[in-house]
UniProtKB/Swiss-Prot annotation:
It is found in: Cytoplasm. This is Gamma-glutamyl phosphate reductase. Keywords: Amino-acid biosynthesis, Cytoplasm, NADP, Oxidoreductase, Proline biosynthesis. Coiled coil: none annotated.
Amino acid sequence: MTKDIAQVMAEVGRKAKAAAAPLSIATSEQKNKALNAAADAILEARADILEANRLDLANAEKNGMAASFVDRLTLNEARIDAIAEGIRAIATLPDPVGEVIAEWDRPNGLHIERVRTPLGVIGVIYESRPNVTADAGALCLKAGNAVILRGGSDSAHSSAAIHKALVKGLEAANLPADAIQIVPVTDRAAVGEMLKGLGGAIDVIVPRGGKSLVARVQSEARVPVFAHLEGICHLYIDKSADLDMARRIALDAKMRRTGICGAAETLLVDRAVASTHLAPILGDLAAGGCEIRGSAEVLALYPAAKPATEEDWSTEYLDAIISVALVDGISGAIDHINRYSSHHTEAIVAEDAQTVARFFNEIDSAILLHNASTQFADGGEFGMGAEIGIATGKMHARGPVGVEQLTSFKYRVRGSGQVRG
């Protein structure tokens, strides 16, 4: 059986590689036509997509899946409208392919340009969110990349119905239907084949899902990976912070949506203002339903908190829980963050410019914010349109991965007969 899957996946890889070549030179007009046609097709197939989703939901109920899982899996009229609108929004983004990033002239008369190009074939491995099928397919198409989509078996029917609409969009623009493929088998061995690179067909892998999925991909992949393992995000309240602003930001950073990777998991408060700032901020969080886990110093000032353990400082809760510590100013905050951070997103609330400069310069995370909530760690909020994920690595893409990050570059060098001699 595994051998059969290897053969099936090798064929998927060959088709993707073949489709990537014409897609890489497709015009902006062609790609946008395909995207808008795909959005139309999704709306036209609304009944079919909802019926497919009902099958997935019935299986989820039979398997006793958690309510949060079922919510991620569920499609309804509004969510289908949002999927179509998201695809249209990607169509309106500037086409990154062919953009001249930099150009210069050499003393010998050579003119050099650095130009954006597609990456080639992208493999996207995700779990129960059927909307990722549309988001990932559309983003890769806009950047001129072929894509192989492997969603979780729990969302197989929903993803297949959405994929069918994406293919209609490609066909409407005379682009190869194999430019967006969905893995035709649910066996997990298919993931292993993708991680091997399908014989050189896949140029990069993007995992979208929980920690165990991302850890497996990062451990086993033989091709580059754009991903983050977890979002242990910090919010630091400096002694120069405006208290009202700090209260608003802390409440939003933790409680707006607790289950996203940009939610704050640790709150650090400057020891110099702990007596005035700590109780109001923690009171707001507690009133909002958040469990407070604090260091011994925090418990002394806010007895309603539970004791924090060493494990808490390196835990991504994805829930209404926050760990809280006091630190010795910006130096203490930097030390704590650099020790425990997953290098995803950190924020500071402060009015002192030198303090903010140190925060930006001395913390090595993908996204750093000043006087703003960590929940802005999102490609849409950055003006990138949708994102395929957030990367915390240092090679190629870092932070939100949008259409621009789904490209590479090449050099075009123009001469007039120069030889090196």
